[in-house]
């Protein structure tokens, strides 16, 4: 959903668009809630309130002021992520395909021969970091740039088994045009940039679990962030390999040698960050022209010093010459060294060429050892070839993708590795490594142990659901880690599957009720965005690959109506009941009937079940940005910080009724997951609320009427407005509550319209118009620890006779209250009041 705020209406009609005019009779929060539950994708918001826009954005729903028609046209035709703090719109707009172009935000790609393999007549365009170079295309009142690129497809091609790039990119473009936009992946980069910038300012120690290559630029400016990954491939791990021969295999039609060099350097850099927590000088020997340095400098101020007879245009200091062994002494401490020396083969015979390569490999290794032999804080990554070698057992082997798999791999060592025990590695074993293993990640740090960290802020995005992790240990970590943002895969199966397959792995599934967190927000991706100053135009869809975002230690926890709130809670219900269901009242009718309340007159205005909780349960797959457990808990403790004006507080029994209705719904739908979720939420309600029932009552509240439009043979027909189980010492407190609600009680608009048999020989008249006040009084009694109400649903009625009678239907008739009293059952009246 996107909300585009206009001062004046527009004549043009847009598909999937609805107009909402600000309702001045309601406060900003109520307007925001109504907007959020509209069912179209585009909302044109007229006579808007800036405060309402702020509320929507904090809820993760993109809401933007529109000043010009160009802005409206651009935003209505595509999806986007909105930085509502800095007023920046990041479009995810692929309409540039109509210019016969694909786009990249990695400069090195533009220096390859990739355009030789594009679709006929197509070109490649560089658009800068997150599309920053496209800002000039949009002369808007807010900053706007198009962050959409095809880098995901290019990188996927590099790691795939496909060789024909034109066929591959054609397939990917067609997929993009025919399937739902993977909005979370597109906006994730914007989110990660914002997230780590915020956390690094607010927390001294930040730990990040499970980063992948898509984050390789994100962390360049954060050397102090501790990374945990899957660990490196060590020289000693080759003991498991059998010997093989040269294979020779082309991975890419266009030259990706620069990409390989960049990955090698970044892998070395992040290893340095892991060990020393600061930025090094980056020395590079060979590997010209290294256009990828330009990409790195878009994200960081790293300094590069390079040696190569060819130009390296983006180096801070380039020596256009060969590097000799005596030059090693020029290299300073606190540095990394990348050695990528290889003479061109030219017309050399392959046997002669092989001798040259082996000699250069030995020379490269000698430079590496020389560099590491003195000083401190150094790591080296050196080009190697498959040959009989003695290598340190703790050194790391790297084999990032390159244009062709031949004899080349890379060795990474720190000072300690260079002095460690060496092992003889046969050429055939190294060929086996080269032929079978691709390094898929620049982050090769040690795996994370599922234990709480006392002083660190832990971030684990899409990293812990894998069934290689012990599920109970994941839950324990989330429950106990005081400061964290952790995601786990939500269980949106219908058979309550404990794990689901994804690609070639299995993930554990989770529901919010699996966790017993303290002061944590459990929300969706878009709910999490709102907390970090972002909003999004397309909410998460229930694809099966959805995640709960669990934020612990956030100062937003008590701000119940500002973040991870109830916005959009009825949207799915509206979509269904206004298009597919038997009636738009279907939800109200079902909730009453499933709790044995058969008086459906006025059910849409006087419903005895919490619609919030009911919708949050049965449609949790569609809107889990609303943190239901937090909402229940903060109301139960009275600690909710409510900024909005009108805010209805439910009685705990209304929440219980909602769980029962949701359970009935789940049984009819054969939805085992909602069935469990409903049961567990009901158990949670009973845990945080101390609900007691007056199933053996000794007092009741009676309402006597001036007029009863039916025949009756009881002495005094009355409405039993709830029963109590209290001691005589509690009578003054109960009476005080009745006095407090006197005006509201006598102001109830009470009506009746028919009679019926409540049970055998109990003939009653229906009563409407009292439930809202009943639940308010229930809450007042609950807060004073006075037992009020029974475990079964309160069905308002007036007993007319203790005999079997025929049903009578009359025109709806208003009843006027004569008196309201508190009486002991089979005893005397202890309190009486009149209007």
From Swiss-Prot:
GO terms for biological process: symbiont-mediated suppression of host innate immune response; viral process. It catalyses: a 5'-end diphospho-ribonucleoside in mRNA + GTP + H(+) = a 5'-end (5'-triphosphoguanosine)-ribonucleoside in mRNA + diphosphate; a 5'-end (5'-triphosphoguanosine)-ribonucleoside in mRNA + S-adenosyl-L-methionine = a 5'-end (N(7)-methyl 5'-triphosphoguanosine)-ribonucleoside in mRNA + S-adenosyl-L-homocysteine; 5'-triphosphoadenylyl-(2'->5')-adenylyl-(2'->5')-adenosine + 2 H2O = 2 AMP + ATP + 2 H(+). One of its GO terms (molecular function) is mRNA guanylyltransferase activity. CDD domains: capping_2-OMTase_Rotavirus. It holds the Pfam family Rotavirus_VP3. Residues 556-692 are annotated as: GTase/RTPase activity. It is found in: Virion. Residues 171-245, 429-555 are annotated as: N7-methyltransferase activity. Its EC number is 3.1.4.-, 2.7.7.50, 2.1.1.56. One of its GO terms (cellular component) is viral nucleocapsid. Residues 246-428 are annotated as: 2'-O-methyltransferase activity. The active site is at 718 (for 2'-5'-phosphodiesterase activity), 720 (for 2'-5'-phosphodiesterase activity), 797 (for 2'-5'-phosphodiesterase activity), 799 (for 2'-5'-phosphodiesterase activity). The keyword Calcium does not apply. Residues 693-835 are annotated as: 2'-5'-phosphodiesterase activity. Its main location: virion. The keyword S-adenosyl-L-methionine applies. Interacts with VP1. Interacts with VP2. Contains a bipartite N7-methyltransferase domain, a 2'-O-methyltransferase domain and a GTase/RTPase domain. The C-terminus contains a phosphodiesterase domain that degrades the 5'-triphosphorylated, 2'-5' linked adenylate oligomers produced by the host cell in response to IFN stimulation. Belongs to the rotavirus VP3 family. Multifunctional enzyme involved in mRNA capping. Catalyzes the formation of the 5' cap structure on the viral plus-strand transcripts. Specifically binds to GTP and displays guanylyltransferase and methyltransferase activities. Has affinity for ssRNA but not for dsRNA. Capping activity is non-specific and caps RNAs that initiate with either a G or an A residue. Together with VP1 polymerase, forms a VP1-VP3 complex positioned near the channels situated at each of the five-fold vertices of the core. Counteracts the host innate immune response thanks to its phosphodiesterase that degrades the 5'-triphosphorylated, 2'-5' linked adenylate oligomers produced by the host cell IFN-inducible 2',5'-oligoadenylate synthetase (OAS). The host RNaseL is therefore not activated. This is Protein VP3. It comes from Rotavirus A (strain RVA/Human/Philippines/L26/1987/G12P1B[4]).
């Amino acid at each position: 959903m996107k909300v585009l705020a206009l001062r004046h209406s527009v004549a043009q009609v847009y598909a999937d668009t609805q107009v909402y005019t600000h309702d001045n009779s309601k406060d900003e929060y109520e307007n925001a809630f109504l907007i959020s539950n509209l069912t179209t994708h585009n909302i044109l918001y007229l006579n808007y309130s800036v405060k309402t826009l702020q509320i929507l954005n904090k809820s993760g729903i993109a809401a933007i002021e529109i000043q010009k028609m160009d802005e409206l046209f651009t935003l209505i035709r595509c999806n986007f992520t909105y930085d509502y703090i800095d007023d920046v719109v990041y479009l995810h707009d692929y309409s540039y395909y109509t210019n016969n172009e694909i786009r990249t935000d990695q400069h090195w790609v533009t220096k390859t021969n990739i355009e030789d393999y594009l679709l006929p007549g197509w070109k490649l365009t560089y658009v800068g970091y997150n599309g920053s170079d496209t800002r000039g295309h949009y002369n808007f009142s807010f900053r706007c740039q198009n962050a959409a690129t095809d880098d995901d497809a290019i990188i996927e091609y590099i790691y795939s088994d496909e060789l024909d790039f034109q066929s591959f990119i054609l397939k990917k473009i067609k997929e993009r045009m025919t399937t739902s936009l993977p909005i979370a992946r597109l906006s994730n980069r914007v989110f990660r940039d914002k997230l780590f910038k915020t956390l690094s300012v607010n927390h001294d120690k930040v730990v990040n679990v499970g980063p992948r290559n898509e984050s390789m630029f994100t962390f360049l400016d954060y050397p102090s962030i501790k990374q945990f990954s899957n660990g490196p491939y060590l020289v000693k791990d080759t003991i498991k390999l059998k010997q093989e021969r040269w294979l020779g295999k082309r991975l890419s039609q266009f030259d990706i040698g620069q990409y390989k060099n960049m990955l090698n350097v970044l892998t070395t850099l992040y290893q340095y960050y892991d060990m020393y927590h600061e930025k090094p000088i980056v020395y590079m020997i060979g590997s010209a022209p290294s256009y990828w340095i330009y990409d790195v400098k878009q994200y960081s101020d790293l300094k590069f010093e390079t040696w190569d007879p060819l130009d390296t245009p983006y180096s801070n200091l380039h020596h256009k010459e060969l590097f000799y062994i005596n030059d090693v002494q020029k290299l300073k401490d606190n540095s990394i060294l990348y050695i990528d020396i290889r003479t061109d083969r030219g017309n050399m015979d392959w046997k002669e060429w092989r001798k040259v390569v082996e000699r250069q490999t030995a020379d490269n290794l000698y430079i590496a050892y020389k560099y590491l032999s003195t000083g401190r804080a150094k790591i080296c990554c050196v080009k190697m070839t498959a040959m009989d070698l003695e290598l340190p057992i703790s050194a790391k082997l790297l084999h990032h993708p390159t244009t062709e798999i031949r004899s080349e791999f890379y060795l990474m060592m720190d000072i300690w590795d260079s002095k460690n025990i060496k092992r003889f590695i046969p050429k055939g074993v190294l060929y086996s490594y080269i032929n079978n293993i691709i390094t898929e990640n620049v982050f090769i740090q040690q795996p994370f142990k599922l234990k709480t960290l006392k002083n660190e802020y832990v971030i684990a995005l899409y990293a812990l659901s894998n069934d290689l992790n012990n599920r109970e240990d994941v839950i324990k970590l989330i429950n106990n880690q005081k400061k964290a943002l952790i995601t786990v895969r939500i269980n949106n199966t219908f058979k309550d599957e404990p794990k689901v397959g994804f690609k070639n792995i299995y993930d554990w599934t989770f529901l919010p009720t699996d966790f017993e967190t303290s002061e944590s927000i459990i929300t969706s991706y878009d709910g999490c965005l709102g907390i970090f100053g972002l909003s999004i135009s397309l909410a998460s869809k229930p694809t099966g690959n959805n995640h709960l975002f669990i934020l612990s230690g956030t100062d937003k926890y008590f701000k119940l109506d500002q973040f991870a709130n109830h916005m959009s809670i009825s949207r799915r219900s509206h979509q269904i009941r206004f298009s597919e269901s038997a009636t738009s009242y279907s939800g109200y009718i079902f909730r009453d009937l499933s709790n044995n309340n058969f008086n459906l007159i006025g059910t849409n205005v006087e419903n005895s079940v919490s619609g919030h909780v009911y919708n949050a349960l049965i449609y949790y797959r569609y809107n889990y940005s609303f943190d239901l457990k937090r909402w229940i808990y903060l109301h139960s403790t009275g600690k909710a910080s409510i900024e909005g004006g009108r805010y209805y507080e439910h009685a705990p029994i209304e929440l219980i009724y909602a769980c029962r209705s949701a359970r009935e719904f789940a049984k009819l739908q054969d939805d085992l997951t909602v069935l469990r979720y409903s049961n567990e939420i009901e158990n949670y309600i009973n845990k945080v609320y101390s609900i007691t029932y007056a199933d053996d009552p000794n007092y009741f509240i009676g309402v006597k009427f001036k007029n009863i439009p039916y025949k009756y043979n009881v002495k005094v027909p009355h409405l039993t407005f709830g029963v109590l189980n209290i001691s005589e010492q509690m009578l003054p407190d109960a009476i005080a509550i009745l006095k407090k609600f006197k005006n509201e009680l006598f102001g109830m608009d009470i009506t009746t319209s028919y009679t019926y048999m409540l049970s055998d020989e109990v003939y009653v008249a229906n009563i409407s118009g009292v439930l809202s006040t009943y639940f308010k009084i229930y809450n007042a009694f609950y807060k004073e620890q006075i037992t009020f109400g029974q475990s079964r649903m309160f069905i308002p009625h007036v007993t007319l006779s203790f005999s079997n009678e025929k049903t009578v239907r009359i025109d709806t008739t208003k009843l006027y209250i004569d008196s309201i009293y508190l009486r002991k059952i089979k005893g005397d009246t202890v309190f009486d009041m009149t209007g």
